[in-house]
Every structure is written in C-alpha cells, then in structure tokens.
Amino acid sequence: MAEEILGNIAEEAHAALLASAGDEATKKSGAIRLPIEDSLDGDFGSRGTAYTDLSTTTSAGTSGQLVERTGGISFGRLLSVAGSCSINLLLPFLNGLMLGFGELLAHELSWKFSWFDKERNRGYRIYPEVRKAAELQERERQRALSRAAGPDGFL
C-alpha cells in the first residue's frame, strides 16, 4: 500500500507539471482544457488524469463538444443568474403566499369550530361580507328571542 502511494506521488507530480505547462499553452491559444478519464470503471492506470486540448480535437464525434469562449453571455451564466434571481425573488413571494393562506385558513377554522369566545373577543372585527350578514342575522334572532321572553327572561 505504501509503495503504491509513493509511486503515485511521482506520477501526480509529473501530471501536475504537464498540466501547468499545458495551461500556459491554452492561455495563449484561448482553447479550454477539460479532464478526461481513461476508463469508465475509474481505473486510471499509470497516467492519472489525462488532459486534452479541445482546439486540436478533429474527430467527428467530439467536434460537437468543442467549447470556445465568445463575446457575450454564455447559456450557463444565464442559467446561473436566473437561478439566483429565482431564489432571491420568487421564493420570498411564495413564502408570503403560504403565510397568507395559512393565516386565512386558521381564521376560517377558528370561526367554523368556534374556538374563541365571540362575546369576549370583540377587538377583532374584520369579517367577510357573508359573515357580517350571518352575524347580523344572529343578533336579530337573539333580540327577537329576548323580546319574546319578556322582562323576567322566561317564555
């Protein structure tokens, strides 16, 4: 195990030297270099990670993968900006919607199940029109019952 690690150190140093020498050449030519694995199963052999210069790629299968930097905004950069804008602008909007609907739902449930005493809690007077009409009808019904009951409270 130790021999393999020590043997790989020399190979890694050699690969780093080749990569730095290749980086200077790509800076001058303007081409982009990408790492390519030697095999799909991850066995890299004695060469480590190989680099290929995309400006010298001539095969028909890889010519479509030629990536060159041009003036303007790249599609990846545009997606990155759109993603950060959606996080900063869209998610707070959705959060506000969820909070608002949650508050409306809690209010409706408390009204439906009479969780709070309506006689004691008179400070909160914001109701939809339908509920205002229902409350007025309930008051009229209570007044009619109290008038019919008489002064002593019995029928």
UniProtKB/Swiss-Prot annotation:
It holds the Pfam family TOM13. InterPro entries: OMP_MIM1/TOM13_mt (IPR013262). Keywords: Membrane, Mitochondrion, Mitochondrion outer membrane, Protein transport, Transport. Disulfide bonds: none annotated. GO terms for cellular component: mitochondrial outer membrane. It comes from the Eukaryota. It is found in: Mitochondrion outer membrane. GO terms for biological process: mitochondrial outer membrane translocase complex assembly; protein insertion into mitochondrial outer membrane. The keyword Membrane applies. Required for the assembly of the TOM (translocase of outer membrane) receptor complex, which is responsible for the recognition and translocation of cytosolically synthesized mitochondrial preproteins. Belongs to the MIM1 family. This is Mitochondrial import protein 1. It comes from Eremothecium gossypii (strain ATCC 10895 / CBS 109.51 / FGSC 9923 / NRRL Y-1056). The lineage of its organism: Eukaryota, Fungi, Dikarya, Ascomycota, Saccharomycotina.
